[in-house]
Amino acid sequence: MNEFELYLDRNGFGNMKGAAAAKALPGTTVLYGAEMDFPTAPCIRKALADFAMKGMYGYTLADDDYRQSVCGWMKMARNFEIQPMDIVTTLGTLFGLNTALRAFTKEGEGVIVQHPSYFNFDKAIANNGRKVVANSMKEENGVYSLDWEDLEAKMSDPNNTFMVLCNPHNPTAKVFHPDELKRIAALAEQYGIIVFCDEIFAETAVKGHEVRPYIEFGPKHGITATSLGKAFSFTGVNHANLLIVDEDLKKRYLAQRKKDHFGSMDPFFYTALRAGYTEEGWNWVQAMNQHTQEIYEMMAKAFAERMPLLSLSPLEGSYVCWLDLRKLNLSCEERQSFLSEEVKLLANQGEDFGPDGEGFMRLNLTATKAVIENFLNNLEAAYKKRGY
């Protein structure tokens, strides 16, 4: 059986995606969030089941076996060698970002982030009393690029001391390629900016695209965040690994992590990582990537042939895609009503990602083909009923 066509029942488990679906109209298609509809890799499920039966769930450390698993994965899946002691564990990417903001910035200082932006980045910045400094990307026919002049102007402002980069970019699915990363790193080095790069979607880059670790280009000022979360749909077990090469940067980060009371990692995460960061796990991720690429192509073909006023940004990395609905000429409220009541779709509105997301919608590609076909048929019927 193709497990990528198996739809998981989320009822009764407190699942966030399931809870959102429960509030929607009956028959609603849920392409909300960035969590897979199908089960995670068999190697992880088996390892967790075996571990659960041991009944041993105590404090857990990042020992040598754990670190070697991360090093092996970075070499196999990312073609990048890291040193075991450059791995810093934390309780999640956003937890790690919050710690970094407190370690390296002061209240009132500016933090640069590319917009449209994953909303929790902006929340983390604001919640720590720092200022969100938007570096709005340029968009042309759904293709996004950095506004380099604006980025340098903001990096050169002494009030701005930190940048959050997301690669692959969420929500646009853009991959920042090596020439772009080199240029970002050169500017950050010139102006003394610390860069926190969220790379938790890195392993989902599609063919022809590669996510190089930011620390390859900015080892003195860069922090790379990695995780099982997206590649294996493991976001509910809080965890992340930060890769920090510079010793002073690492020392300062660890001091703040201690203040934030890190404690120990979740033993289930330890077990899942060692099982997933293997050749079997990597083969599963590559098969999952092929499935999401087919879903994307299925959507793109339907829009081009059946609903030409709608279009998708290119999918370079991640399993979310960015749908452009601007040609429908609907206000935010009208668009929400059209999608939720007429199309019966639950997904992330573009406005969730800031003003630069207006007129767009983020869709999750890690669904079954049957679910996507149902969504496309419902969308086409509502689209044509409106006379588009």
Question: For each predicted feature, which ranges?
Answer:
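PLP-dependent aminotransferase-like
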Residues: R102-L165
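Helix C-cap/helix->beta junction micro-motif
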Residues: N128, Q190-Y191, V343, R386
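Active-site phosphate-binding strand-loop segment of PLP-dependent enzymes
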Residues: K138-H209
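Conserved glycine-rich beta-strand-loop-beta hairpin in the small C-terminal domain of fold type I
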Residues: R274, Q290-A300, L312-L325, G357
